[in-house]
Amino acid sequence: MSALRLCPHHRPSEVQVAEEIARVAVIPYINIEHFPNNIPGTAIIPGTQQFNPDPLNYGWRDYGNRVGLWRMIELMDQIGMRGTVCLNSDIIREYPRIVEETNKRKWAFIGHGINNAPANFLSGIDEKKEREIVGGVLKAIEKAVGRKTKGWLSPFLTHTNNTPNILADLGVEYLCDYTADDHPFPLNVKKGSLVSVPYTVELNDIPAFANVGVSSEAFGDMIVDQFDVLYDEGADNARCMPICLHTFWVGQPNKFKHLKRAFGHIASHKDVWLTTGDDVNDWYRKNR
């Protein structure tokens, strides 16, 4: 049975999220990913993906880890915002300073597969192989950051019907693959418990830029507009607002300008909880 099937559906008035703290819980998810240079990956120019190597797209993606992320860290430091790092475990080996600096800032870390090569997507693999992949990623992150990995986001949000049960069995507390609600909700697992913490494909730079084709300014406007609606609704019933970002997209200067504007708008409001997936999970488990 799917983990999502038969999960309780709530009317908005029936759920509260940190209502004594804020009207909106803003969760910036920062996807920090590694793409092997000999395998096609997310591309700004798809026409060269078949080349090996593909310096055009590999270099564009690598800009995120070399430059874009640090621009984002500086901004988030300025406004007191912590990220929830969706981490490919290969980053630990390839870019150890990234893990050191974000961990120093007490950012949250959730598992996001080995790397973002299609060969490491979870869809279609057997349970034994999936358990090996998930378990290996969790152990690598826990060793690198020195604490339990509470959350998981499957690479490209690809998972199997076994994924939720494997995660719960391995001690993971929340999953971000389902984008179905403005609030956390429980998922059905065979043993233990697993919570769905909000994630989004709406306020997500990859589909916004690569699939929908919005402008940099429009993406900033989308963040502001989403916040304004949820902030108004949060006066009666607090909401979660995930913002899902990739360093090689919004870390580019022309896009970063509008991300900075949007984050400044959020930070200018009172009764806003700038938080992480870990903290939302902890709050929900304590108060549900």
List where the protein language model places each region.
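Catalytic alpha-helical scaffold of carbohydrate-active enzymes acting on polysaccharides/glycoconjugates
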Residues: S2-G151, F156-V195, G220-I243, G251-R288
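Short, local alpha-helical segments
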Residues: I206-A210, P242-W249
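Positively charged, amphipathic and often flexible ligand-engagement surfaces
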Residues: P184, S196-A218, A238
